[in-house]
C-alpha cells in the first residue's frame, strides 16, 4: 500500500518544494501577527480618548484568548500521535487522547470565532452603535478569522511530508 493509498485526501502535499513549506509557515505567522495587531489596535483605540462612550472590556478579550489557546493546543500536538497505526511508542489510548486534545483545541478556535460574533451582535449591533464603534466590534471578528487562517495554514504545512526531513531522537 502506497502513501497515497493510505492517506485520507487524494492530493499530495509532499510534492511541494521545501521553500513552499517555509512560505506556509511564514504566511501563518503573518496571519497570527495581523490578528493580534488588529485586536490590540482596537483595544488601544478604545482605551484612549478616541472612544468616549464605549470601551473594549474583558468580555471582548474572552474570544480572543480562546482562539490563542486553541492555536497553541492545535499546533502543539505531534501529528504522528493522532493515528493508532504507527508502531513507535503509541497505542490506541494515546491516539485517542491526542485526538481528544486536538478536538478541544479546534473547539476553542471555533468557540472564539462564535464568541466574537456573539459579542459583536449583543454589545455593538443590538445597542445601536455605528461608525468607528462598530469597527471596534468587528476587529474581534476579523482577528478571530485571521487566527483560524493562521491555524489552518500552520496545520497544513506541519503535515507536509518532506523527503529530506530527518527526526533524530536520543
From Swiss-Prot:
Transmembrane segments: 23-43, 54-74, 101-121, 136-156
InterPro entries: UPF0220
PANTHER family registered for this protein in UniProt: SMALL MEMBRANE PROTEIN-RELATED
Keyword annotations: Membrane, Transmembrane, Transmembrane helix
Family membership noted in the UniProt record: Belongs to the UPF0220 family.
Organism: Schizosaccharomyces pombe (strain 972 / ATCC 24843)
Membrane topology: Multi-pass membrane protein
Presence of the UniProt keyword Nuclease in the record: no
Protein name: UPF0220 protein C8D2.02c
Subcellular location: Membrane
Amino acid at each position: 500500500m502506497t502513501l497515497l493509498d493510505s492517506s485520507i485526501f487524494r492530493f499530495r502535499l509532499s510534492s511541494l518544494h521545501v521553500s513552499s513549506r517555509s512560505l506556509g509557515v511564514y504566511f501563518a505567522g503573518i496571519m497570527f501577527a495581523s490578528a493580534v495587531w488588529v485586536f490590540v489596535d482596537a483595544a488601544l483605540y478604545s482605551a484612549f480618548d478616541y472612544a468616549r462612550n464605549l470601551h473594549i472590556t474583558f468580555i471582548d478579550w474572552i474570544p480572543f484568548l480562546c482562539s490563542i489557546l486553541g492555536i497553541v493546543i492545535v499546533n502543539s500536538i505531534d501529528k504522528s500521535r493522532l493515528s493508532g497505526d504507527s508502531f513507535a511508542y503509541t497505542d490506541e489510548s494515546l491516539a485517542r487522547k491526542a485526538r481528544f486534545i486536538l478536538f478541544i483545541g479546534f473547539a476553542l478556535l471555533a468557540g472564539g470565532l462564535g464568541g466574537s460574533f456573539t459579542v459583536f451582535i449583543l454589545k455593538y449591533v443590538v445597542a445601536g452603535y455605528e461608525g468607528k464603534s462598530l469597527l471596534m466590534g468587528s476587529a474581534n471578528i476579523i482577528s478571530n478569522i485571521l487566527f483560524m487562517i493562521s491555524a489552518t495554514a500552520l496545520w497544513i504545512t506541519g503535515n507536509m511530508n518532506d523527503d529530506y526531513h530527518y527526526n533524530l531522537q536520543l
